[in-house]
Amino acid sequence: MSGTLATPRALLSLLVAASLVVAGAAQADDAGIRPQDIKRQALSSTVVEMAYSTSQQALFVSAPDWKEEARSRVLRLDPNTLAIKAEIPLQVKGFGVALNDAGNRLYLTQAFNGEVGVVDTTTNHALGSIKLLDKAVLEQAYKQAGISGKRLDFLLAELKKFKITEDYLYRLREIKYDAQSGRLFLPGLGFGVDSVLYVVDTKAGKLEKVIPGFGYNAVGITLDEKGRRVFVSNMQGQVITLNADTLAITATHEVQADQLLNLVYDPAGNRLLGVDQGIDRDDYRNHHLGHDYVKRSSGHRVFALDADSGKVLASELTDEVPIGLLLDERSQRLYVANRKGVRVDHGAGTLTVFDAKTLKRLQTVDLPPHPNSLALDPKGDALFVTVKNDGASTKAGKPESVVRIQLHSN
């Protein structure tokens, strides 16, 4: 998503995101990733996010279909072999995932119809969806939001260029489940307007609240379940903190990272770990804010922030266009999926491995074309990565893949 407005598929493709060769393991220790540790399985025309179920001993993968929406599915994989054990049909495309393993429910963001899909992980059946918002006439919605002048002119010109009249005012990308409250938290990325946070009561199966105040392109989200905090990052260099119980915004911090696309919370160090994406979206952001945004970071970096203040504790370069990240608390390793390009014919994406305490880079593993999202076996034995196509692979009709990486104790 290069800006606030684009075609719906382009909007999501910038956010969400083959032979495998291990590159330059010289910096890695004996516990590094070796070629024989990597297994790849081609699965579907599109794969996006994953959730590992301990109770089911299964890996669930969202597999939306762009050509024929009714062919969208959730794939249930054997986590050891990556064999498909079940295909769960969906009526619409599902992208981001959150798992309530104790309740045997998988939740999916349905980015283009304003709903959250629900899947029973024991029966492998879709249970319908929870409605969050309806389509709006966008010009009317912008005027009702008080948008005028140059900003309104810019937005209307974009609508005309892409021939859009009605659409959903917010895009649903990431989703987090809070086991203590039974709530789902979903940033609603504003389609020309400031972003919001959707709160879903899963026990009642309905929308509980829509919370405003999340700025330009709210994208990243993570939970501090014990501390009862929700953290949301946006594309204007802010991290917003919400009380997970009262649903009150308790802090908005200006941070030294411009585009924190995804976040994870480190409870041991009370830190927020995030990837600063580094994609040029200046024109859209400046029109949205009404002034020229002054960049604070070079982008393509990993950040460690103090969760209380937003202060930078550490920052290191990763490879270009980082997307997903995952913290292995046991081994204190931070894994980052880097696309290394957007809409390129030949992708050369990588997985970078960092010491989570210091952010020292330990290893770089080639995972072309475009590694996207990550999941971990709770025992810490295996790391899973979705790998998306580049332009050439898409044109050739090749399926996208999931990679399993055997991990070793340090």
Explain the meaning of each model-derived region.
Residues 5, 16, 20-410:
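Predominantly soluble domains enriched in secretory-pathway, periplasmic, or organellar proteins
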Residues 1-14:
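Bacterial N-terminal signal peptides that target proteins for export
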